[in-house]
Amino acid sequence: MVRRSVTLPQLQAKKALGEPITMLTAWDYLWARLLDAAGVDVILVGDSLGMVALGYPTTLPVTLDQMIHHAQAVRRGVSHSFLVCDLPFLSYQESPEQALRSAGRLIKEAEVQAVKMEGASPVVQAATRRLVEAGIPVLGHVGLLPQRVHQLGGWRQQGNTPQDAAAILAGALALAEAGVFAVILEHIPAALAQQITAQLKIPTIGIGAGPHCDGQVLVTADVLGLSPQVPPFAKVYADLGTQAIAAIENYCQAVKSRQFP
């Protein structure tokens, strides 16, 4: 069977069809090629690459130029998956026009197909409208917002009070009204995610938000056992970190003992 490229209308249609959307992150050509070959629906060049690939403690130091650099590498490894890229911290919060310039660079220079912004503030809502008007698809993101980690006091679950839950629901509805094609629900109670999913016509993609979303996303390094610390909501499907260290140790020993080459 010939595999076709994933399109935005196909992703949105999956909600009505009851077909869960799969999404994982990539930060270079190697991982993009592997995810694409595995049939992942959506590949996200997340600003989590700041922590996974660049060694920062948070996503905040990542620049737009760095995102473009990594997205260009990912683009070269993608043949079929739909490609989305994060707008990093302070590349869109100033104004809708700043967001348009930043997103435009990702579209033109890295050939991504959509961008993601965090939160549902008035500026983000206005920026979403501006980007959609310009023909740039936007993925929303509510709940735990990594770009606000200091403001939130860490990587804690959000939406645990009635007021916070109502604000997250209102934010998701506002983003849908502004024109996002889907919304990520990060680290919120499963019941809240279920409520949001039921009220939205667009797909919801969960990360630590329970089983009721229209799709799921995780950081690939967490899935493959490559992260030193894995979030409590993630599942490790392979321990590649341990296997890689063992393989490298075997290589070094073989060289030192002159068993290789």
From Swiss-Prot:
3-methyl-2-oxobutanoate binds at residues 47-48, 86, 116. Its EC number is 2.1.2.11. It catalyses: 3-methyl-2-oxobutanoate + (6R)-5,10-methylene-5,6,7,8-tetrahydrofolate + H2O = 2-dehydropantoate + (6S)-5,6,7,8-tetrahydrofolate. It is found in: Cytoplasm. The keyword Metal-binding applies. Pathway: Cofactor biosynthesis; (R)-pantothenate biosynthesis; (R)-pantoate from 3-methyl-2-oxobutanoate: step 1/2. The active site is at 186 (proton acceptor). Pfam families: Pantoate_transf. GO terms for biological process: pantothenate biosynthetic process. Its cofactor is Mg(2+). Binds 1 Mg(2+) ion per subunit. Mg(2+) binds at residues 47, 86, 118. GO terms for cellular component: cytoplasm. Signal peptide: none annotated. Keywords: Cytoplasm, Magnesium, Metal-binding, Pantothenate biosynthesis, Transferase. It comes from the Bacteria. GO terms for molecular function: 3-methyl-2-oxobutanoate hydroxymethyltransferase activity; magnesium ion binding. The keyword tRNA processing does not apply. Belongs to the PanB family. Homodecamer; pentamer of dimers. Catalyzes the reversible reaction in which hydroxymethyl group from 5,10-methylenetetrahydrofolate is transferred onto alpha-ketoisovalerate to form ketopantoate. This is 3-methyl-2-oxobutanoate hydroxymethyltransferase. The lineage of its organism: Bacteria, Bacillati, Cyanobacteriota, Cyanophyceae, Acaryochloridales.
